[in-house]
Each structure stands twice: as structure tokens, then as C-alpha cells.
């Protein structure tokens, strides 16, 4: 089993800061690279919202699964960080802008399409696809393929917060070469609000499991003003580009390989291991087996 890394003594990297609503983030130097440490949100930070105490676990597990099935995502590892008298679980994410690259999120690129009537934050599916076709950062056909690959990954992992600010492009500051950035920000996957009591209830009650596959979480993308249901959309749509992504990615989803990885993740309880494995299997079967 992998051993959790203690990042407490790693030197902080000056001049690096990261945005985002879910938890604190700092940059440290570890193993000769820059890593962003993501801390789970505390109740004091989000007093009116559900706890995201498992978001760091979700970030690492989901990012690694994306890489396992061949859709490039950030490199991550789990660790701990001592804050005062408390030891916090953190997810370390390798900073893919290290080395002179600049990240532009899709929201910013969407704002460059000046003949669009919507702003950068809009997540209407047709509008997003229209922007993909009109943007000039990368070749539109290749970006459409990437977008639907990302959709398939998010569907498998139950990501309810893939918005225009957490995917995008890397531009080399020297050569101006542009590439699609690795996928990141997976903290809203795999039911991060579920504590062990909720996990046990979901495992013991098929109706509870089914609700968290067919009713929620939904995609942040919208169709006709309503959030898209992952299962309904995958089951009923035969869009050529989505079909290509499914045909490409689903054969790579080896559940036993994923389960073996989860068994090696440090800091998980046995209940959490069982939950993540059964939840991923249930989503996989609902999305892809019965098509």
C-alpha cells in the first residue's frame, strides 16, 4: 500500500497562488517539482453548505482513474500537512504550468468569441459546442474529441462541477505553442460529501445507490435550461463524436485494475474502499453496459 507523504516540511514556493472555491491551496516544492496542495474545506469556510471532507480523496482517486483509462489528467498523490495541532489530509497536484506555461481556462477562451451572445461562464451545451467550433486556440475537431472524452470520464466518476473555469489550455510563454491542459479539479467526483454513515446507507440500500446514479449528481452542462443527467444523456444520444469517445474509452475501463489501484490508496478505511469500488462499478454498468 502506498504511504502518505508528509508535506509539512516541504519548502513553500513564492509567487504561486491558486483560485477556486473548495478549500485552501498552497504551492510547495517536492521531489524537484512544484506541487499544489489542496486542503479540504472546513465547516467554518462553508457554513451553509455540505461538507466536502472527502474532496481530497476524490481528487486523487478520480485523477488517477482518468489516467488509467487513457484520458490525460494531472499527476496527484495523497499526503498530510500539519497545521497547528491538526494533521490535515491533502491532495498534492503537480503544477502543470511549471516550466513557463500559462493556463487559460475555457471561460477565458469563450470570451474571445465576440459574435456569441453569451458570456464565458455559460454552460449551455449547444453554446459550449458552438464556442469549441469558433475558438482559434486549437483545432476545433480535436477539441470536440477532447471535450467528449472529458464528458465520458466525468460521467463515470459522477462529476457535478465541470464548468468552464476548470478545463482549458496551456500556452508556452516562449514558443506560443498551445495544447489542451491535463484534466484537473476532480474534487466534486465520487460523492465527496458522503461521510461513512452515508456510504454505509448507500451500500446497504439499492434505492439509495440508484438515486445517486440516476437522479444525482448531474452534469453542470445544461440542455434546454436544465442540467444534463449523465445516464439519460449517454443512454439516449447517438451523437457521432460522443459515440467515438465511448467506443475509444470504455474498452480501456478495466474495473479490476481500478479496484487494485483503490486497494493501494493510503488513508482510506475499508468502508471507503468498498464504497468507491461499488459506486464506480454501478455507474459503469448503468452508463455503458446496457447501451
Language-model regions, residue ranges each:
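A short, terminal or domain-edge coil/loop segment
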Residues: 2, 9-11, 126-140, 195-198, ...
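ATP-dependent phospho-/nucleotidyl transfer catalytic cores
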Residues: 94-151, 259-266, 286
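Aromatic-acidic/polar surface patches that form glycan- and anion
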Residues: 54-56, 142-146, 269, 273
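Conserved ATP-binding subdomain of kinase catalytic cores across diverse folds
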Residues: 1-115
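C-terminal catalytic region of ATP-dependent kinase domains
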Residues: 67, 172-291
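Conserved kinase catalytic-core segment
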Residues: 126-195
Amino acid at each position: 500500500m502506498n504511504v502518505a507523504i508528509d508535506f509539512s516540511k516541504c519548502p513553500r514556493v513564492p509567487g504561486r497562488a491558486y483560485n477556486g472555491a473548495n478549500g485552501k491551496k498552497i504551492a510547495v516544492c517536492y521531489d524537484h517539482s512544484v506541487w499544489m496542495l489542496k486542503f479540504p474545506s472546513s465547516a467554518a469556510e462553508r457554513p451553509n453548505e455540505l461538507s466536502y471532507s472527502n474532496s481530497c480523496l476524490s481528487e486523487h482517486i478520480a485523477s488517477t482513474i482518468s489516467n488509467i483509462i487513457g484520458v490525460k489528467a494531472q499527476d496527484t498523490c495523497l499526503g498530510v500537512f500539519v497545521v497547528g495541532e491538526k494533521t490535515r489530509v491533502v491532495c498534492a497536484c503537480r503544477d502543470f504550468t511549471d516550466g513557463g506555461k500559462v493556463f487559460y481556462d475555457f471561460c477565458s477562451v469563450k470570451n474571445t468569441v465576440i459574435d456569441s451572445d453569451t458570456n464565458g461562464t455559460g454552460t449551455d451545451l449547444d453554446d459550449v459546442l458552438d464556442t469549441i467550433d469558433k475558438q482559434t486556440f486549437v483545432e476545433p475537431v480535436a477539441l470536440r474529441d477532447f471535450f467528449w472524452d472529458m464528458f465520458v470520464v466525468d460521467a463515470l466518476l459522477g462529476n457535478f462541477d465541470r464548468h468552464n473555469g476548470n478545463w482549458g489550455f496551456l500556452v508556452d510563454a516562449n514558443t506560443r505553442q498551445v495544447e489542451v491542459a491535463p484534466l484537473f479539479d476532480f474534487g466534486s467526483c465520487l460523492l465527496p460529501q458522503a461521510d461513512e454513515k452515508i456510504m454505509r446507507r448507500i451500500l446497504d440500500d439499492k434505492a439509495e445507490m440508484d438515486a445517486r446514479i440516476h437522479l444525482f449528481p448531474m452534469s453542470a452542462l445544461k440542455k434546454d435550461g436544465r442540467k444534463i443527467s449523465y445516464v439519460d444523456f449517454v443512454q439516449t444520444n447517438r451523437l457521432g463524436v460522443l459515440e467515438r469517445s465511448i467506443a475509444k474509452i470504455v474498452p480501456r475501463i478495466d474495473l479490476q485494475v481500478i479496484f487494485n489501484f483503490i486497494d493501494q490508496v493510503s488513508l482510506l478505511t475499508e468502508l471507503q474502499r468498498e464504497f468507491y469500488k461499488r459506486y464506480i462499478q454501478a455507474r459503469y454498468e448503468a452508463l455503458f453496459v446496457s447501451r
